[in-house]
């Protein structure tokens, strides 16, 4: 099909002072500049966009959300009412992946199910930082308080559940409960992959989630010490309002969608905005996704985490991803060109 085109092709470049003294470059493109744009399934992207756009409070976005809800032809909708904008701070783009882990667990301890998934205690909310990971797991501060949501069978998978921030627990009877981020102990996150490189155990290009898990399991004592290297500890809450068939809740409190949701830095990319992804490296991706999530490691205008789905296969795919490319935010037309006025003020 032939989509609508910009009435006058234009590339407008401007520099504006944002986020302190840093310089951010905004480049307005035409849709013909987006590699692979014509080949994408725009209807899938529009469906994901409509799932969260009603929560965007800005009038420019609200008016476009109302139009999107009427069921327009998807590619035409995006090309008529948006302009592609590259926002850059001079750092190269970086794409990584995330997923929703699924662990084996039970609602009562016993047998293999010995590792508790905790709710946050009240005093941890009031202190920053609170106790470290080592202090929480080797002391008795959590004992006898009824803070356990469930017990799982693998402390390594529990550690990675805390990195992801949400996940599912499959019970012995086949049922599933979902847990979401419920707070943290206030300590900074330290990468155990980086520590393995520092110790000379692996080269940086060799490190992935699967490599780390396997090493910890092969070296139980040193593996436990490695996990304690990260003092950050994440607590959870039970999430019952989302059916197991849907994705986990993202930062907009709506389910995220595999292959169409990204986590972004909301200081630069509006939550709910469509974002064109051009991921290079192994298995290039050219796809319109939607910014529906955030992450503590996602900083900068050219940084995104792609959601791969639930379970082990999704985890392996997400763990392999660390590639360059380009992010292009689709902004309402008036908002895109208002950048010129803002830069002149």
Summary of predicted features, one role per range:
Residues 16-20:
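N-terminal signal peptide c-region/cleavage motif recognized by signal peptidases
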Residues 22-345:
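Solvent-exposed, well-ordered loop and adjacent helix/strand elements within mature globular domains
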